[in-house]
Amino acid sequence: PQAFERDPALVWQWYNWRKRLIAEKQPNAAHYASAELAKKLPELLATTQNVDGFHALAGLTGILEMHGNIYRTRCLACAAIAENREDVSPETPCSACGKARLRPDIVWFGEALPKNVLQAIYDRLRSCDAILVVGTSGTVYPAAGFAVEVRRREGHVIEINVDDAHKPYANDIYLRGRAGDILPRIVELI
């Protein structure tokens, strides 16, 4: 937040550059498999810490983006959130109120995660009997605590990851490898 306060033009220049880089890429097999898994398991609650929007682009609806989305803006004047795939500058007006007070709808270091997103996750964690953890270090909270919470209630933890670093929870099933290789195979089995 401090960098944005000091030089919003520079921050927007960086985010516009990142949006262009991401736009050149496509969702991978893991993103598409996640969307298929959600279709087969309607009770699935999908969350991501990524801000690239690839899950939604792959067809996964209702995903909770914990850290926001690089293709959205949030107005500091009226709090309106809007999709914006175009370049943004400090002079870009908000589509809701017309004021030029937009920032990326991204959670920056030192900021709290969106309360509504966290509440939806914790509500589901209280009743779920299993959690699938995919491609994360498992060390950044609060997300690292999700598996801990499920395990505390004697739920099952299934993890897919390329490294087997120590996690603050025990896995029932650990599948070592790339999510893009493993998730599609899981979807085929369901």
Regions found by a protein language model. Give the residues of each.
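Conserved catalytic core of sirtuin-type NAD+-dependent deacylases
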Residues: 1-190
